[in-house]
């Protein structure tokens, strides 16, 4: 998806940069990644969040930022990329995918908690962030 939406950006290079930011910056560094949610990628956001959490990052979007997942900004212009223009059947497919994803995220919520908060953040605090 990245290679299509953010051309000429290449996803493999983005992965390398995420790892550099996470591993080669000072301990006082916090990195926030935000995604422009739009018609072309809204279906894939659960995949992106799961990928991010499974990387074991220690500085990228750690709780409470994006609940340990990612931050979002919705695209409103141009109008044809606004998620509101999607057909109802596709919105239902997105809803189904998100609802299937939520239990995984809830079971793995601690993956987004930074090490200095481990044991200090309870599930309910995370859930309500």
Go through the PLM ranges and name each one.
Residues 1-129:
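Radical SAM enzyme [4Fe-4S]-AdoMet core and its adjacent flexible, acidic
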